[in-house]
Amino acid sequence: MSLTEARFHDLVDATQQTLEDIFDESDLDIDLESSAGVLTVKFDNGSQVIFSRQEPLRQLWLAARSGGFHFDYDEESERWMCDKSEEQLGEMLERIVLEQADIKLEFEGL
């Protein structure tokens, strides 16, 4: 069953808030910018990751140095899953943040 527009926005809003909380609570030198449904995370080494919502596709997109990734929400596991690798958003973020910014963070629940 496809996500309704309202449910999709609620899920993305909640996910972006969780991400902001994780980065804020890390006490690391990270800049967060949120505007028009796009969350940009800037690390002190100048690299960044960008999260954006793709409403027509009901997907959450992640842009990083290693590429662009598209996530569909899986109602059964209640997780965002990469549409290519089937990797959970949280697992991929742990790997990307470590590779890109040499920071070890846990994204539990994502």
Swiss-Prot record:
An example Gene Ontology molecular-function term: ferrous iron binding
- Show the coiled coil region(s): none
Q: Which Pfam families match?
A: Frataxin_Cyay
Q: Which GO terms describe its biological process?
A: iron-sulfur cluster assembly
Question: Which SMART domains does UniProt cross-reference here?
Answer: Frataxin_Cyay (SM01219)
Disulfide-bonded cysteine pairs: these are: none
One cellular component (GO) term of this entry? cytosol
Q: Which Gene3D superfamilies match?
A: Frataxin/CyaY (3.30.920.10)
Instruction: Could you list this entry's UniProt keywords, alphabetically sorted.
Output: Iron, Metal-binding
Family statement: Belongs to the frataxin family.
Q: What does this protein do?
A: Involved in iron-sulfur (Fe-S) cluster assembly. May act as a regulator of Fe-S biogenesis.
Q: Which HAMAP family match?
A: CyaY
NCBIfam families assigned: FeS_CyaY
Q: What is this protein called?
A: Iron-sulfur cluster assembly protein CyaY
- UniProt organism field: Pseudomonas fluorescens (strain ATCC BAA-477 / NRRL B-23932 / Pf-5)
